[in-house]
Amino acid sequence: MEKEGALRAKRAAGERAAGMVEDGMVVGLGTGSTVKYAMERLAERQKEGLRILGIPTSFQTAIRARELGIPLTTLDVHPDPDIAIDGADQVDRSRRLIKGRGAALTREKIVAAAAGRLVIVVDGAKMVESLHGVVPTEVLPFALAPVLASLKTLGAAPVVREGVAKDGPVISDNGGFIVDAGFGLIRNPEEVERAITLIPGVICTGLFTAYTGKTSVVVGREKGEARVL
């Protein structure tokens, strides 16, 4: 169970991000515990007259949005959403990200790339000097063995993520396996992202380095405040 301070920080970040949404916007809705608070605040703002459409990045988010009464659309209808709100596992000083602990990284990256603005909501624990550790990577099941071998040649220690409350590997909303590739300190995230992406059979990597120019980071604090970077 999370501590109250951490929950206050997440709520503060999510609600601050929801305040950045303007009437009439199409909003990419990320996946995760901090985005949940943004969605709850957006639902409250709808009752105050806000009109929005949401594009969910996972089944979980779509279900939650419907429960909250947030009307949904698709990238087929709205290929260039105004803004996307999402979480992250790590954020460095250059606003480069590691994402994918929730196994929704592929759709999150598609929406992040399409959106005019990307707002990342995190608590202070997610802010790091340098990206490091596990990089979630979605992989076609057919290509699992050669992808694992290729990741090892890049210096990673890849592990197929196992499911919880199910036997066998985690299966993404797209039908892919999730491989957690441990890299240690990532000195050149752009280079590592390109190298992983070029491996045949990789669907998506959790390194997000191409969107720093349109990214704002909302950092929640345990006292219930939030600041925008």
Give a label for each model feature:
Residues 2-86, 212:
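N-terminal active-site beta-alpha-beta segment that forms phosphate/nucleotide-binding
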Residues 2-5, 59-229:
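Conserved phosphate- and dinucleotide-binding cores of soluble alpha/beta proteins
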